[in-house]
A protein has these predicted regions:
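Short, solvent-exposed loop/beta-turn-alpha elements that line the ligand-binding surface or hinge
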Residues: 53, 139-153, 196-198, 214-223, ...
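Glycine-centered hinge/linker elements that transmit conformational signals in sensory
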Residues: 206-208, 249-279, 324
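Extracytoplasmic/periplasmic substrate-recognition and gating elements
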Residues: 59, 81, 85-86, 91, ...
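Extracytoplasmic "Venus flytrap"/periplasmic binding protein-like
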Residues: 82-156, 162, 188-190, 195-198, ...
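Conserved C-terminal helix/tail region of periplasmic/extracytoplasmic solute-binding proteins
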Residues: 52, 187-188, 193, 212, ...
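Long, aromatic- and glycine/proline-rich binding clefts that accommodate carbohydrate-like moieties
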Residues: 156, 160, 315, 322, ...
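Hinge/lid segment of periplasmic solute-binding proteins
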Residues: 48, 53, 98, 123-178, ...
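Extracytoplasmic/periplasmic solute-binding protein
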Residues: 164-172, 177, 187, 201-259, ...
Length: 454
């Protein structure tokens, strides 16, 4: 019988979000999907938003998240207000806690029988909450909406909502990774500014031409630096496979993943030297010191929302966006993403009311509003494709990337697998182990984890 890991959903989510920071920081003046802005709040302090309190006979509902300031707070509270004005039965109030703390408090509140009514959660750990009875089974509510209700969401995101054939949330936002490239730098290097690399071999070829050295031999600009994408993410983009699946199969040392890390090590860390790359990347930061904004790298991998850094700090930069390069000629151009789900905690006092709000904020109209204001890639397919968003090139590229974006999950069959693999990947970058050696050892460790989790 599988070991019960009741508290793992919170601990795993916090570890995972350091990987995904699911995600990005959409704008300097916005509350981020990570911890940066919200941790300024006093730890453990509950802040209710400005949306109206329950009045008259309305049932008061609370949505919990970490969006405590900036554009994120404004938009979620506007959605609460829009919902409140759309009907006269429920009144939704926005409540935020600091990043991470919100999940710890929700877990405690759920265990105490007084959970929030709706909560924004990590998309990768839905199954943990489902197994631990921390999330409400939405299957019957979804069935009442008629056939095809869940078809409005990207399938890999809806798949992350499922546990034992039942749905325990709806996907809210996601992301993907794309390649940003400096068109002017391409032209200066004799490269076609309208032809970004489509394979790893092209990426390396272009990177060499885009490198610029100073008189002292150090680098003024690198054509490409792989360290702006997490090592685990590079593994997922190699073959489009997570480390494990729901059946406990393990895909750590696949030939494609081995090849990817041979490329990363040989073409960059061995070629330039780890010391040189570490010294060069030590100057990377945010804002004006963002490596792509500052012209320190000519090609850069990040989320679509990161275009706001270029917009705000280098408005005249002539750049393009493209899919991540395929590992081999003719291969898929895979990407990697995470995201957030919207869930009704187990034991919520008015499931029907909570469900009405969940439907409202995942609807096409609400998701278009969210995307247009904070630039997240939303889970609703029609909303993500809306013509009103297509003036922003990164939205078009995100749409193109989504079909081959791997949305990884922290599987119950191998909880924390990514954390186990990561040190082995570090050994590759340090030059202590070959990719084959390191990934073979990581494969064995994750296989043991699967056995231990039964």
């Amino acid at each position: 019988m599988r070991k019960k890991l009741i508290g793992l959903s919170i601990a795993t989510a916090l570890g995972i979000m350091s990987l995904t920071a699911c995600k990005s920081q959409p704008a300097e003046n916005a509350s981020t999907n990570g911890a940066a802005d919200t941790t300024a709040q006093a730890e453990g302090t509950k802040e209710e938003g400005t949306s109206k309190e329950a009045s008259g006979d309305r049932v008061k509902l609370e949505i919990w998240d970490w969006w405590g300031d900036g554009q994120y707070k404004y938009v979620i509270e506007q959605l609460c207000q829009n919902f409140n004005e759309s009907q006269d039965t429920y009144e939704v109030v926005h409540v935020n806690y600091p990043w991470g703390d919100v999940w710890t408090k929700a877990l405690a509140a759920t265990a105490a029988g007084n959970p929030p009514d709706v909560i924004i959660q990590d998309i990768r750990t839905v199954t943990h909450r489902a197994e631990a009875k921390q999330a409400t089974d939405l299957t019957d509510l979804i069935a009442k909406e008629g056939d095809g209700f869940t078809d409005q969401f990207y399938p890999q995101l809806m798949d992350a909502m499922m546990y034992d054939g039942h749905a325990y949330g709806l996907p809210y936002v996601t992301d993907t990774r794309i390649l940003y490239y400096d068109k002017d730098a391409f032209a200066e290097a004799g490269l076609d500014p309208e032809a970004p690399p489509e394979t790893w071999a092209q990426l390396v070829e272009y990177a060499r031409k885009l490198d610029v050295k100073k008189d002292n031999g150090s680098y003024e600009r690198l054509g490409f630096f792989p360290g702006t994408l997490e090592w685990n993410a590079w593994a997922f983009t190699a073959d489009g496979k997570d480390y494990t699946d729901a059946d406990g199969n393990v895909y750590v040392n696949t030939p494609e993943k081995v090849k990817m890390f041979e490329n990363i090590y040989n073409d960059f860390y061995q070629y330039y030297g780890k010391k040189e790359l570490d010294s060069f990347s030590a100057e990377f930061g945010n804002g004006m010191t963002n490596p792509f904004v500052a012209g320190k790298v000519a090609m850069w991998v990040n989320t679509p929302t990161e275009f706001t850094k270029v917009r705000d700090y280098a408005p005249d930069k002539n750049y393009g966006v493209a899919l991540l390069p395929a590992l081999e000629e003719g291969g898929e151009q895979y990407s990697w993403g995470g995201g957030f789900s919207v869930e009704i905690p187990y034991g919520a006092k008015d499931t029907e009311g909570s469900w009405e709000f969940v439907k409202f904020i995942t609807s096409k109209e609400s998701q278009i509003y969210w995307a247009s204001e904070v630039y997240d890639t939303v889970a609703n397919i029609e909303a993500s494709q809306d013509p009103s968003l297509m003036d922003i090139p990164v939205f078009k590229m995100a749409l193109e990337a989504m079909p081959t974006t791997v949305v990884t999950q922290d599987r119950l069959t191998a909880p924390g697998a990514s954390d186990i693999v990561l040190p082995y990947l570090d050994e590759i970058i340090l030059g202590n182990k070959t990719p084959q050696e390191a990934l073979d050892e990581a494969q064995a460790s994750v296989e043991q984890l699967v056995q231990d989790s039964k």
